[in-house]
């Protein structure tokens, strides 16, 4: 059986938030090439609101374009389906 080759290039936006207790939360917002920072910020805010529902309030601190890369298969599938993907990095609950 052949494994699907990932060909999608994505933009990675490095994102930080902070919980009410001071914990730093780090995650990436991944968009297809041609995305923009306002879209990445909107998706980051939606994610922060979603995870704040189950914990103490979380505040978005910063988001900035970091780099482009070839998407991993899971990321490619999520971006193709939803138009974006959140990848947790540090102190971040699973977004899915």
What kind of feature is each model-predicted range?
Residues 25-51:
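Short, flexible N-terminal segments of the mature chain
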Residues 18-20, 32-36, 89-91:
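Generic structural motif
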Residues 43-96:
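Acidic, low-complexity intrinsically disordered segments
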Residues 2-11, 33-43, 96:
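Phosphate-binding glycine-rich loops and adjacent basic patches that engage nucleotide phosphates
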Residues 1-25:
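Short, charged/polar N-terminal "headpieces" of proteins
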Residues 13-15, 29, 44, 86:
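Generic structural hydrophobic/aromatic packing signal, biased to beta-strands
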């Amino acid at each position: 059986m052949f494994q699907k080759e990932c060909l999608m290039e994505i933009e990675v936006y490095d994102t930080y938030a902070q919980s009410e207790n001071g914990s730093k939360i780090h995650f990436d917002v991944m968009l297809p090439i041609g995305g923009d920072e306002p879209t990445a910020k909107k998706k980051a805010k939606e994610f922060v609101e979603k995870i704040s529902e189950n914990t103490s309030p979380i505040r978005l601190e910063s988001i900035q374009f970091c780099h482009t890369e070839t998407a991993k298969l899971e990321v490619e599938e999520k971006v193709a389906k939803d138009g974006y993907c959140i990848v947790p990095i540090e102190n971040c609950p699973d977004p899915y």
